[in-house]
Amino acid sequence: VVSNASDADCVEMNSNEFAYILYTSGTTGTPKGIVRDIGGHIVALKWTMKNIYNIDSDDIWWSASDIGWIVGHSYIVYAPLFKGCTTVLFEGKPVGTPDAGAFWKIISDYKVKSLFTAPTAFRAIKKEDPEGKFFSKYDLSSFESLFLAGERADPDTIKWAENLLNVPVIDHWWQTETSWAISSNCTGIEMMETKYDSACKAVPGYDVKIIKSDKSLAKPNEMGDIVVK
């Protein structure tokens, strides 16, 4: 197929033209079509690869997601291309394809430096192989960090992963609307102390506040609405 393919010329685009329209999941309401610009998207995603995920152009990166979701859009396809690193595209599940060692085999075979996936994936692995017997079959010396997002990462799952992998397990938070992390421990800048059930602090470029119903700033341990600028 490649040998018979014809070249496609590059086409100049304005930086503020649309890269894509991707719809939100609709979990809390009607799905919203999110329009992403080209220029800002490129700048932001390339910046995150080094500063949040500590990935260089000669590293192997794996985002175990689906291209139909924002994580797959941003971190299977676009961000690795902008950074120039190798990206792993995996079609399968963390268990049953063929077993609970599927993730470890891929990390070992391709010398993956960092993995980004959903907490559900690790809950499934933990359920099938709580003692980590499959993990011990593979060489994961290349592996340096695990990033979790997409849903709440419960402390039990994070602790299990930390004990098994012996690498930082980082819960970070973002949405389809942003296309990259709002808050995270930035491994390429400086690792910060954090606590379980926390997605650390706002990533550079974001101003995050908790606002009460009277529009005043919430104090520590007070409930309110999240406001992001």
Roles of regions detected by a PLM:
Residues V1-Y23, T30, N54-I60, F143:
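Conserved pre-ATP/AMP-binding loop-to-beta segment of ANL
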Residues K209-K229:
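Conserved beta-loop-beta connector loops within the AMP-binding
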Residues W47, K159, D197:
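Active-site phosphate/pyrophosphate- and oxyanion-stabilizing loops and adjacent acidic/basic residues
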Residues D66:
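Residue(s) in the substrate-gating loop at a strand-loop-helix junction
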Residues C85, K113-T117, K126-E193, D207, ...:
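Gly/Ser/Thr-rich phosphate-binding loop
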Residues I42-I60, I70-S114, K127-K133:
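Conserved AMP-binding/adenylation subdomain of ANL enzymes
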Residues A19-V43:
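Conserved AMP-binding A3 loop
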Residues C10-M13, K195-A202, L217:
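Short Gly/Pro-enriched turn/cap motifs at secondary-structure boundaries
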